[in-house]
């Protein structure tokens, strides 16, 4: 579906993406992960044809990215989605459906279905009066008005509460089940793990790890999850806000906590990726010089060097610019 070869993008000589190669198959959910400034948005915008590569090729099916015909098969959700504040959700979506020449009845059915699924209420409310989560849902519905084969979502759950985030992530999975290819970027490894088939981790414009999330974790370190249950579960500690915290090391254990909590008449209120673990994975990968990465050397050294440098364990200490900060 997508073939990226030797992709390089510079802004006035500044290398935002430096030689990316990856492929995404049809129906796959593909995550682009990395710290602020890693080059995720640049990569996604290049796939969407909104940015021209400085070097390299980006092919989407039979088209080059940027080909006008390709756009008809694409749904792009930018990180910040400015909406026309005076329009209602319905009129806004109808406006975009008209731009894509979608017949009225078909457009209404499609957008109402999407908004039902995302549980968006008040569809005739002004967009300017909607909450951030509601606006994000409208933006997601907009990305689907043309029934695209490929969806490119930049931080789809950015700034959303846990419940809305879950809707959005579950919905992303549903889209792939309906045969759509989804490429999305995120900071949160838990979000990525819950929906992505494969992932690339970027840092300073470079892909520094790739594979399924379990493959990456196995190779580069362990992530832990803090699961907040509404009832006591085995090994949990009560938190100040009346929840019960259990820290576990993998998704099977997260699922076991959820089942235990539900069996006890409660549920899971929130799940958080343990940040130091995430940073350990990142430091393990990104702290090594590129040459050492090639042959697997330098892994323990780089984390140790970061700590010896005076930083907290897992904290980056070398952010001389805006690149490479989680
Ligand atoms: N139009 C631009 N002009 C100059 N530099 C840019 C431009 N767009 C991005 N950059 C720089 O390129 C680098 C990569 O930016 P990009 O937005 O792709 O990163 P990102 O991984 O999406 O970051 P974030 O997580 O903060 O959104 C950053 O250092 C950024 O400052």
What are these regions (language model features)?
Residues 215, 221-289:
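Short, charged/small-residue-rich alpha-helical element at the C-terminal edge
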Residues 151-155:
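Catalytic Walker B motif of ABC-type/P-loop ATPase nucleotide-binding domains
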Residues 94, 98, 105-122:
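Conserved ABC ATPase "signature" region
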Residues 56-66, 70:
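Conserved ABC transporter NBD signature motif
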